Amino acid sequence: MLREIRDLGFEYAELSHGIRLGLLPGILEAVDAGEIKISSLHNFCPLPLGVNHASPNLYEFSDERARQRELAIKYTLRTFELARRVKALAVVLHLGSMEMKDYTEKLTRMLERDGRKSPKYEKLRAEAAASREARKAKAVERVYETLRIILPEAERRGLKLGIENRQALEEIPLEGDFEFFFREFDSPNVVYWHDIGHGQIKEHLGFLHPIQHLESLAGRLAGFHIHDVVFPAGDHAAPGTGTVDFAALKSFVKPGHIKVFELSPSLPVGAVQCGVAHVKTTWGNE
């Protein structure tokens, strides 16, 4: 897998939340041999024993069950250890979610069928927004408590914690809460990780303006997950094939940022190469 990434011309790769324990020996061999470098890991990596598919939300910092939060901490710390072993700079985190209806799927279906101007759509969108605000407090409190436990461990290891924006409406932090979050956690080891596809989906749904969002968080921005979105929510598409305006994002992209192409494994090599070329042509050498 890593050799295939290298053969596509990449010097660095991110180890994802789909890495099984059995894959580690080969990964470490490739890294130790200098065949590829690791920029970042996505929690949880490696997967817990017995879990064989990508499971970034297997355990959540927001879970009301203490045992589940303990497991989230345990496997996050294990991710930290692997990150140090492969000399990665950052670990990307999902912080958790609140219990509520699946508005994301309902709104997506309605958006595809009726569009944003539908009165029914706007009514459901407003209901979802109000429900989130009413339900978030306890989940956010648990997230903060858990982060206060793991942050010193990240600082001790010299790791950045990349707090990723999410596409599901129930996930934390909410779009308007990121600035409050970063005031609460002002450590330089806590940074913002912008998933371009997730931001685009939230724009389609009417919950986010990605450019304004990035403007407000530019000082904490450290990395990107790069992919496009086929309207309304077909993410992990090759850049240049969907609705993302990569040119509008260019001013936020800096040489020191970690940039990870997060593309569907079903894409043919040619589509990947075209997508990478689209971003490089648009962003230049940043």
Where are these regions (language model features)?
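Short beta-strand and adjacent tight-turn residues that come in two discontinuous sequence segments
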Residues: 15, 41, 93
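Residue-level detector of anion-binding/catalytic polar loops
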Residues: 11-12, 37, 89, 160, ...
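Short glycine-enriched loops at secondary-structure junctions
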Residues: 42-49, 96-98
